[in-house]
Amino acid sequence: MARTRVRIPSLLALSAVTLALVTGCGNNGDGKNKDTSSPAASGAPETGKKPVVVVTTTWEGAFAKAAGAEDVKVIVPQSVHHAPDYDPKPSDLAAVAKADFVLYAPFEPYAAKIKEAAGSKAKLVEVNLDNDPDKVKAEVDKLGGLFGTADAATTWKTGFDAEYAKLNKDLQTAWPGGKSPNVVTQVFTAWAAKLAGATTVGTYGPEAVTPAQLAGLSAKKPALVLDNAHMSTGTVLPDSGAEQVKIVNYPGEDLDLLPVYRNAAAELKKAMSTS
């Protein structure tokens, strides 16, 4: 998902300036090094201290917030759909330098370089970005344990389960003819098919659909095609008669994950009413 790659050269060029800003008054002129044995220096927040979390995108940010983090800084703005267009600012590296945790996804290999450029001792945490409910709750559990916010994570999961069940039930009542619709979904939007209780008859992506795949998927006669809004290549199965539904994976700037499910449910319900 190329949406979240940033320019590493820009980051490295900024690192010297940023480090000067954040460390210039570090030794108080006494020539002694600071103690690096504190919890903060090892990447873990001090006892009773709320963790400072830096994330690459709003998706990781929403997971962190769900897990109980309150101090969350997003590096790549939500408005950047093609991250090479984003020029990192000194404030980005300054934020990483002060972080306890830096969250990234496995398809974002630049995260370690961001941390290195900032000279941060933060703990680098890989997050499995998938809105499948079971995977979301597993990540929230993991992060809550790391942050020391397990109780907050448990509370969020309870609310999430209730909202998910409500949306799933509402979508099932909208099934055309009372029957689970057949769908073809992009690999990163399969969670939305699950939310609708739909029957997945095929998947595609993240690479472009080949002529052979096009023929094979069209032959399955899906009622719906779920398209990843962040990686859309236009109409996936032209002339198939399937209704194409755009699914958004990334949360907004409020880092609230629940609207992602509500918005997907609204789009799915609308599509099922016309299929």
Identify the role of each PLM range.
Residues M1-T23:
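Sec-dependent bacterial lipoprotein signal peptides
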Residues V22-S38:
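Bacterial lipoprotein signal-peptidase II cleavage site
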Residues E46-A67, I75-D87, H230, G252:
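Extracytoplasmic "Venus flytrap"
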Residues P51-V52, K135-V136, K220-S275:
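Structured C-terminal subdomain patch of bacterial secreted/periplasmic proteins
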Residues V53-V55, E60-A64, A152-G205, V209-G216:
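Basic- and aromatic-lined ligand-binding clefts that recognize polyanionic substrates
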Residues G68-K89, F188-A215, K246-L257:
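Alpha-helical, coiled-coil/dimerization segments enriched in small aliphatic residues
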Residues D71-A150, G234-A242:
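Acidic/His-rich segments in extracytoplasmic proteins that coordinate ligands and/or metal ions
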Residues E116-V183, L255-S275:
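Extracytoplasmic substrate-binding proteins
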